[in-house]
Amino acid sequence: LKNTFAQKELFLFQNMLALLEKWDDDLSFDKVIFGTTDFEHVWEHMIDIAYGETGIFNKEDFFPYAEWHLNNVSGNAGNLYPDTICLFSQEKLHGCIIIDAKYYGYKDINYKTLPSMESIAKQIHYGQYVFKKASNFGIESPNTLIFNVFLIPANFSSKKNTKKPCYIGYAIEPWNDNEKMFEKIFCFAIDCQSLINNFSKDKER
């Protein structure tokens, strides 16, 4: 069983890397200027455009929600909103990659500056919701896998293979058994300029 899970985990990890590496090789943009100083929201939007499944499904279907029940009357207590959803299907494996775009400085990476318990718990909750609703999203199978990811911006302009994502590490809740794939949130750094260039190229088409 452990070997089987390890093979599934490796397969999905490779799929995630393939997704993150889907840059074009003929980018020619030198500089891109956005009309906002609030780059955190720009970063989140570009990640969603680059990796999200636009037009394939209603993203709101992936929003977990809660209800109050008072005197036999129920009322909506609000929703949680994942940044980006990406479905995948290959051979007998089906699943979903849930991406949270975090605008943190790559040079200052340590366990104190990375996403906190609040963000980690939200990602795990998103994973639980998608896992429970897998049949609604067409990804239900004995091998359904849900993959959780944090993406942060970086500047790799002075390094080789600048378009390759850099694996940072992962977060877990140590008190939990973490048997489900979505209970481990992997963190990658993405070259910011490459993402901006790729986003701009898509917008010009």
Cite the ranges covered by each PLM segment:
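Catalytic core segments in nucleotide and nucleic-acid processing enzymes
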Residues: D26-R205
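Interdomain/boundary linker segments immediately adjacent to catalytic/signaling cores
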Residues: L1-H41
